[in-house]
């Protein structure tokens, strides 16, 4: 992407608007939203990166390891489950988000928070396609995180193997 500076600049602006640390949605939750969206899209590269970023920013390692079981894990609140459900549905092709899901979102999240949640899902729609199409090799830290926390649940680096 560095070959297209305007593209990089636009992406950085979009990323910083979504990943603001002082947003209304917990930064760690946004990373887990991006993670389950990436899993739905099948992008092992982004799954490893979002798990590593979540770990790096202080998300409990047990929660990262349990994220694929968020619907039943006691580590997740109902509000988090509702947001993660929308992430799975919103990342599906075709999109599977429903009016009922958004009604549930509104029970726990205000409009600004919902925009942050959907922004994270949409941003990773782009990043999943970019990284899965170009198939970059995984860097050491995300690869190690993937192997430690995600591989026990079936994750592999796939075409992103170093």
Regions found by a protein language model. Name each.
Residues 1-162:
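Hydrophobic alpha-helical segments
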